[in-house]
Amino acid sequence: MAEVEKTVRTLTGRVVSDKMDKTITVLIERRVKHPIYGKYVKRSTKLHAHDESNQCKIGDKVSIRETRPQSKTKSWALVEVVERAVEV
């Protein structure tokens, strides 16, 4: 049998919390068309992702990928920091 390569899901979002050790909370926003009215509405999802080196800060734009479950709520891992947050 030939090996079937599994596609890895990758998402981009903003870090909204970095208070946990080696874990970040990422807010993913998407636009969905309303089934009846046709208007595009913003929908959002919060995901917990593994950040091995604690390099992310609140406001950073990050890329995450799906992995095996790390804990009860964490099954995503940090791929890269796309854009650093502006410090004021």
UniProtKB/Swiss-Prot annotation:
GO terms for molecular function: rRNA binding; structural constituent of ribosome. One of its GO terms (biological process) is translation. Transmembrane segments: none annotated. Keywords: Ribonucleoprotein, Ribosomal protein, RNA-binding, rRNA-binding. It comes from the Bacteria. Pfam families: Ribosomal_S17 (PF00366). GO terms for cellular component: cytosolic small ribosomal subunit. One of the primary rRNA binding proteins, it binds specifically to the 5'-end of 16S ribosomal RNA. Part of the 30S ribosomal subunit. Belongs to the universal ribosomal protein uS17 family. This is Small ribosomal subunit protein uS17. It comes from Ectopseudomonas mendocina (strain ymp) (Pseudomonas mendocina).
